[in-house]
Amino acid sequence: MITEDKAYDILALNQTATPEEILARYQTLKDQYKKIKEETKDLKTQLAYQLKQIELDDVFIYLRTCQKI
């Protein structure tokens, strides 16, 4: 379950981050995870980054629900 503290930890931001900073960090991480997942041939790494992408999407949904973004 995502909490506010965990959401900011996953994004590596502090809780004073602006909505613009949150969205920028989300998009940066999303792009990085996608690139790593696509470039690796190792199935275990692909699955790990798939889980990271899902977790990142959960953070986005949580913060949107809390009206932080």
Annotate the PLM regions.
Residues 1-51, 55-68:
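N-terminal J-domain/J-like co-chaperone modules of DnaJ/Hsp40 proteins
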